[in-house]
Protein backbone atom coordinates (compact mmCIF):
# COMPACT_ATOMS: atom_id res chain seq x y z
CA UNK A 1 0.00 0.00 0.00
CA UNK A 2 2.75 2.40 1.02
CA UNK A 3 4.70 1.46 -2.09
CA UNK A 4 1.75 2.22 -4.34
CA UNK A 5 1.24 5.63 -2.73
CA UNK A 6 4.93 6.44 -3.11
CA UNK A 7 4.91 5.32 -6.75
CA UNK A 8 1.82 7.41 -7.47
CA UNK A 9 3.39 10.42 -5.80
CA UNK A 10 6.57 10.01 -7.86
CA UNK A 11 4.53 9.86 -11.06
CA UNK A 12 2.67 13.01 -10.02
CA UNK A 13 5.92 14.85 -9.36
CA UNK A 14 7.32 13.73 -12.71
CA UNK A 15 4.23 14.97 -14.55
CA UNK A 16 4.36 18.30 -12.75
CA UNK A 17 8.02 18.77 -13.64
CA UNK A 18 7.37 17.90 -17.29
CA UNK A 19 4.59 20.47 -17.35
CA UNK A 20 6.80 23.05 -15.64
CA UNK A 21 9.67 22.55 -18.09
CA UNK A 22 7.24 22.81 -21.01
CA UNK A 23 5.68 26.17 -20.12
CA UNK A 24 8.69 27.89 -18.56
CA UNK A 25 12.16 28.87 -19.72
CA UNK A 26 15.09 28.85 -17.32
CA UNK A 27 17.13 32.07 -17.38
CA UNK A 28 20.25 32.92 -15.41
CA UNK A 29 20.17 36.50 -14.14
CA UNK A 30 23.31 38.38 -15.15
CA UNK A 31 24.39 41.72 -13.72
CA UNK A 32 23.24 43.99 -10.92
CA UNK A 33 20.31 45.83 -12.53
CA UNK A 34 17.68 43.95 -10.47
CA UNK A 35 19.38 44.08 -7.09
CA UNK A 36 18.35 43.56 -4.35
CA UNK A 37 15.70 41.22 -5.81
CA UNK A 38 18.22 39.17 -7.76
CA UNK A 39 21.99 38.64 -7.47
CA UNK A 40 22.14 40.46 -4.16
CA UNK A 41 24.66 38.01 -2.73
CA UNK A 42 27.49 38.22 -5.25
CA UNK A 43 29.61 35.69 -3.35
CA UNK A 44 27.16 32.88 -4.12
CA UNK A 45 26.86 33.57 -7.85
CA UNK A 46 23.91 34.28 -10.11
CA UNK A 47 20.25 33.68 -9.32
CA UNK A 48 18.01 31.79 -11.76
CA UNK A 49 14.47 32.68 -12.82
CA UNK A 50 11.83 30.60 -14.54
CA UNK A 51 9.81 32.53 -17.10
CA UNK A 52 6.25 31.56 -17.99
CA UNK A 53 6.16 32.05 -21.76
CA UNK A 54 2.39 31.50 -21.96
CA UNK A 55 1.45 34.31 -19.57
CA UNK A 56 0.59 37.29 -21.78
CA UNK A 57 -1.14 39.47 -19.18
CA UNK A 58 1.17 42.05 -17.64
CA UNK A 59 0.48 43.83 -14.38
CA UNK A 60 2.19 46.60 -12.44
CA UNK A 61 5.17 45.19 -10.59
CA UNK A 62 5.49 42.04 -12.70
CA UNK A 63 9.06 41.02 -13.39
CA UNK A 64 9.50 40.20 -17.06
CA UNK A 65 12.19 39.08 -19.47
CA UNK A 66 12.49 41.24 -22.58
CA UNK A 67 14.13 40.50 -25.90
CA UNK A 68 16.22 43.43 -27.10
CA UNK A 69 18.19 43.84 -30.29
CA UNK A 70 21.89 43.00 -30.44
CA UNK A 71 22.22 41.69 -26.87
CA UNK A 72 21.00 39.01 -24.50
CA UNK A 73 17.47 39.32 -23.07
CA UNK A 74 17.09 41.67 -20.10
CA UNK A 75 15.05 41.33 -16.92
CA UNK A 76 13.07 44.32 -15.63
CA UNK A 77 9.98 45.30 -13.63
CA UNK A 78 6.75 46.55 -15.24
CA UNK A 79 6.23 50.15 -14.16
CA UNK A 80 3.59 51.48 -16.56
CA UNK A 81 1.08 50.01 -19.01
CA UNK A 82 -0.44 51.28 -22.28
CA UNK A 83 -2.00 54.72 -21.91
CA UNK A 84 -0.26 55.51 -18.62
CA UNK A 85 1.37 58.91 -18.19
CA UNK A 86 4.85 58.66 -16.67
CA UNK A 87 7.07 61.32 -15.14
CA UNK A 88 10.03 61.54 -12.78
CA UNK A 89 9.57 64.43 -10.38
CA UNK A 90 11.24 65.97 -7.35
CA UNK A 91 9.47 65.57 -4.02
CA UNK A 92 10.67 67.75 -1.15
CA UNK A 93 10.29 64.94 1.37
CA UNK A 94 11.58 61.95 -0.59
CA UNK A 95 13.71 63.32 -3.41
CA UNK A 96 13.18 62.14 -6.98
CA UNK A 97 10.24 59.78 -7.44
CA UNK A 98 8.21 58.15 -10.16
CA UNK A 99 4.83 59.64 -10.94
CA UNK A 100 2.24 57.50 -12.73
CA UNK A 101 -0.98 59.14 -13.88
CA UNK A 102 -0.38 62.08 -11.56
CA UNK A 103 0.28 59.99 -8.44
CA UNK A 104 3.64 59.43 -6.75
CA UNK A 105 4.30 55.72 -6.36
CA UNK A 106 6.07 53.96 -3.53
CA UNK A 107 8.72 51.45 -4.56
CA UNK A 108 9.84 49.50 -1.53
CA UNK A 109 11.70 47.04 -3.76
CA UNK A 110 14.34 49.56 -4.86
CA UNK A 111 18.00 49.19 -4.06
CA UNK A 112 18.96 52.06 -1.78
CA UNK A 113 22.62 52.95 -1.80
CA UNK A 114 23.54 54.61 1.48
CA UNK A 115 25.43 57.84 0.90
CA UNK A 116 25.31 60.27 3.81
CA UNK A 117 26.67 63.14 1.73
CA UNK A 118 24.11 62.66 -1.01
CA UNK A 119 21.28 60.85 0.75
CA UNK A 120 18.49 62.72 -1.04
CA UNK A 121 19.61 61.68 -4.50
CA UNK A 122 20.61 58.18 -3.47
CA UNK A 123 17.30 57.54 -1.78
CA UNK A 124 15.38 58.90 -4.71
CA UNK A 125 15.69 58.39 -8.43
CA UNK A 126 18.23 60.97 -9.49
CA UNK A 127 19.83 58.71 -12.09
CA UNK A 128 16.45 57.89 -13.58
CA UNK A 129 15.52 61.57 -13.55
CA UNK A 130 18.63 62.50 -15.55
CA UNK A 131 18.13 59.75 -18.14
CA UNK A 132 14.38 60.27 -18.38
CA UNK A 133 14.54 64.01 -18.99
CA UNK A 134 17.82 63.83 -20.90
CA UNK A 135 18.78 61.09 -23.34
CA UNK A 136 15.35 59.39 -23.42
CA UNK A 137 13.55 62.59 -24.30
CA UNK A 138 16.23 63.41 -26.88
CA UNK A 139 16.25 59.97 -28.52
CA UNK A 140 12.51 59.24 -28.29
CA UNK A 141 10.69 62.59 -28.49
CA UNK A 142 7.63 60.85 -29.95
CA UNK A 143 6.89 59.38 -26.51
CA UNK A 144 6.57 62.74 -24.77
CA UNK A 145 3.81 65.30 -24.51
CA UNK A 146 4.48 69.03 -24.53
CA UNK A 147 4.29 68.94 -20.76
CA UNK A 148 7.40 66.77 -20.71
CA UNK A 149 5.55 63.70 -19.49
CA UNK A 150 5.77 60.34 -21.26
CA UNK A 151 2.71 58.50 -22.54
CA UNK A 152 3.06 54.74 -22.96
CA UNK A 153 1.85 53.81 -26.48
CA UNK A 154 -0.74 51.10 -27.12
CA UNK A 155 0.78 47.64 -27.16
CA UNK A 156 3.85 48.73 -25.21
CA UNK A 157 5.06 48.91 -21.59
CA UNK A 158 7.48 51.01 -19.57
CA UNK A 159 9.87 48.87 -17.52
CA UNK A 160 12.75 49.67 -15.17
CA UNK A 161 15.39 47.79 -13.20
CA UNK A 162 15.19 47.85 -9.40
CA UNK A 163 18.77 49.08 -9.18
CA UNK A 164 18.17 52.42 -10.87
CA UNK A 165 21.83 53.37 -10.54
CA UNK A 166 22.93 50.52 -12.79
CA UNK A 167 20.21 49.55 -15.26
CA UNK A 168 19.64 49.86 -18.99
CA UNK A 169 15.87 49.89 -19.20
CA UNK A 170 13.08 52.06 -20.60
CA UNK A 171 15.07 55.18 -19.73
CA UNK A 172 17.64 53.89 -22.24
CA UNK A 173 15.67 51.90 -24.83
CA UNK A 174 12.33 53.67 -24.58
CA UNK A 175 9.11 51.74 -24.12
CA UNK A 176 9.10 48.04 -25.02
CA UNK A 177 6.65 46.42 -27.43
CA UNK A 178 4.70 43.60 -25.85
CA UNK A 179 5.88 41.38 -28.69
CA UNK A 180 9.39 41.76 -27.22
CA UNK A 181 8.36 40.27 -23.89
CA UNK A 182 9.43 36.64 -23.53
CA UNK A 183 7.22 36.12 -20.49
CA UNK A 184 6.62 36.80 -16.81
CA UNK A 185 8.91 35.46 -14.11
CA UNK A 186 7.04 32.63 -12.43
CA UNK A 187 9.59 31.44 -9.89
CA UNK A 188 13.11 32.16 -8.77
CA UNK A 189 15.93 29.97 -7.50
CA UNK A 190 18.54 31.74 -5.46
CA UNK A 191 22.21 31.11 -6.09
CA UNK A 192 23.33 28.17 -3.99
CA UNK A 193 19.85 26.63 -3.68
CA UNK A 194 19.84 23.05 -4.89
CA UNK A 195 17.57 22.04 -7.75
CA UNK A 196 16.08 19.12 -5.83
CA UNK A 197 15.03 21.37 -2.94
CA UNK A 198 13.67 23.95 -5.36
CA UNK A 199 11.51 21.48 -7.31
CA UNK A 200 10.42 19.68 -4.15
CA UNK A 201 9.13 22.94 -2.67
CA UNK A 202 7.47 23.81 -5.97
CA UNK A 203 5.47 20.59 -5.91
CA UNK A 204 4.73 20.25 -2.20
CA UNK A 205 3.75 23.91 -1.73
CA UNK A 206 1.25 23.71 -4.57
CA UNK A 207 2.87 26.54 -6.52
CA UNK A 208 2.29 24.63 -9.74
CA UNK A 209 -1.42 25.47 -9.46
CA UNK A 210 -0.46 29.13 -9.84
CA UNK A 211 1.63 28.25 -12.89
CA UNK A 212 -1.33 26.46 -14.47
CA UNK A 213 -3.63 29.42 -13.84
CA UNK A 214 -1.12 31.88 -15.27
CA UNK A 215 -0.88 29.89 -18.48
CA UNK A 216 -4.44 30.96 -19.29
CA UNK A 217 -3.70 34.68 -18.95
CA UNK A 218 -4.11 35.97 -22.50
What feature does the model see in each segment?
Residues 16-35:
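Aromatic-capped interface at the extracytoplasmic side
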Residues 7, 25-28, 37-218:
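Soluble "head" domains of membrane/secretory-pathway proteins
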Residues 4-22:
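Hydrophobic membrane-insertion alpha-helices, especially the h-region
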Amino acid sequence: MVGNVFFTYCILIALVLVFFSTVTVECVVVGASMRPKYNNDTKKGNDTVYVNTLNKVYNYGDIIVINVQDRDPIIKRVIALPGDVVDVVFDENDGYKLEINGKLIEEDYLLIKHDEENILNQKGLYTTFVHFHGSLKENHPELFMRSGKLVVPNGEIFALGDNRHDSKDSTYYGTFKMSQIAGVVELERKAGEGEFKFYWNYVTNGKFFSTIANCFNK
